[in-house]
């Protein structure tokens, strides 16, 4: 992995997504198929009904194509790369299935929660098996704990795929946060590029940054297209996989602090309502609470991006200093 291949990776994934996205938007508009809006959501979100979704279809395609040709050129086609591509594509397909039900059946809910959870768990199990023979290390230690860590991997990937999915409720929020998150892991990988598997991880992060940069102009407010579950599930699972393969699992709790807070707000809201009959927030995930408090989408986006950026800087700096 050198400077030229890094630049071409970002440029390739960016251009494929940026140049082809208008055609995908035009296709979905012609089909009159778009996002269905939750009835219990903010009333002003109703105007977003019909906005094309499944933008993840193109930015995942762009990332995969770019990763494969650069990896073939640089001799980086390894098990590490296949593991990352597996997570990206399979979780994307799970989301695509869910999005298709919503779009073509004109409903906001996709397939049943247990069906989605089962697919996510099975995919995470396959990822675990792929790397089982190499052994695992905890992010802040060297103790190998076998099957117990395997369960942790499944929980980590499924958990963060859903956390990013919950966060994807405002125009541009997740695409902006994800660029920051992948950039943080790119820096960690580049600093340790001599470590086995790190060049492949760097390539993966570069491609994801490029493709999301190409997607962002069409996704920020007012969004011309949403990434859909296809995009958000794939991004969340991929970030979890990257953190695992870098052996800095716990760093995702900091780098992905916004995803964690969004998920925690939902859990706390449900727990509070079930036990006391009272709600802690006006609406969850928490970005809706701020909407209901009078914040504009742009204000929420910018504040959340800044929180994500500061958290990423803290996490990366700590890892580089402490190791």
From Swiss-Prot:
Family designation: Belongs to the glycosyltransferase 4 family. MraY subfamily.
GO cellular component term, pick one: plasma membrane
Biological classification of the source: Bacteria, Bacillati, Bacillota, Bacilli, Lactobacillales
Enzyme Commission number(s) of this protein: 2.7.8.13
Protein task: Catalyzes the initial step of the lipid cycle reactions in the biosynthesis of the cell wall peptidoglycan: transfers peptidoglycan precursor phospho-MurNAc-pentapeptide from UDP-MurNAc-pentapeptide onto the lipid carrier undecaprenyl phosphate, yielding undecaprenyl-pyrophosphoryl-MurNAc-pentapeptide, known as lipid I.
Protein's gene: mraY
Catalytic activity: UDP-N-acetyl-alpha-D-muramoyl-L-alanyl-gamma-D-glutamyl-L-lysyl-D-alanyl-D-alanine + di-trans,octa-cis-undecaprenyl phosphate = Mur2Ac(oyl-L-Ala-gamma-D-Glu-L-Lys-D-Ala-D-Ala)-di-trans,octa-cis-undecaprenyl diphosphate + UMP
Name of protein: Phospho-N-acetylmuramoyl-pentapeptide-transferase
Cofactors (names): Mg(2+)
């Amino acid at each position: 992995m050198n400077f030229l291949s890094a630049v071409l990776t970002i440029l390739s994934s960016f251009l494929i997504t940026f140049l082809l996205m208008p055609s995908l938007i035009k296709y979905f508009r012609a089909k009159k198929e778009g996002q269905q809006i939750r009835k219990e959501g903010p009333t002003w979100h109703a105007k977003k009904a019909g906005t094309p979704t499944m933008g993840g279809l193109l930015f995942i395609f762009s990332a995969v194509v770019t990763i494969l040709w650069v990896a073939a050129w640089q001799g980086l086609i390894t098990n590490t790369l296949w593991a990352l591509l597996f997570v990206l594509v399979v979780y994307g397909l799970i989301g695509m299935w869910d999005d298709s039900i919503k779009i073509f059946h004109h409903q906001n809910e996709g397939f049943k929660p247990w069906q989605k959870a089962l697919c996510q768990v099975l995919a995470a199990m396959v990822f675990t098996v792929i790397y089982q023979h190499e052994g695992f290390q905890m992010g802040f230690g060297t103790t190998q704990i076998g099957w117990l860590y395997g369960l942790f991997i499944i929980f980590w990937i499924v958990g963060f795929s859903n956390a990013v999915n919950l966060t994807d409720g405002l125009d541009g929020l997740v695409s902006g946060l994800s660029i920051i998150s992948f950039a943080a892991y790119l820096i960690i990988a580049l600093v340790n590029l001599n470590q086995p598997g790190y060049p492949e991880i760097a390539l993966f992060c570069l491609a994801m940054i490029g493709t999301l940069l190409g997607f962002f102009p069409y996704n920020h407010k007012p969004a011309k297209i949403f990434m859909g579950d296809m995009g958000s599930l794939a991004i969340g699972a991929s970030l979890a996989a990257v953190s695992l393969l870098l052996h800095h699992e716990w760093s995702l709790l900091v780098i992905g602090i916004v995803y964690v807070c969004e998920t925690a707000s939902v859990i706390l809201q449900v727990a509070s309502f079930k036990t006391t009959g009272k709600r802690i927030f006006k609406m969850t995930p928490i970005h809706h609470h701020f909407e209901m408090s009078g914040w504009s989408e742009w204000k929420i986006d910018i504040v959340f991006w800044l929180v994500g950026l500061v958290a990423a800087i803290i996490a990366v700096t700590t890892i580089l200093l402490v190791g």
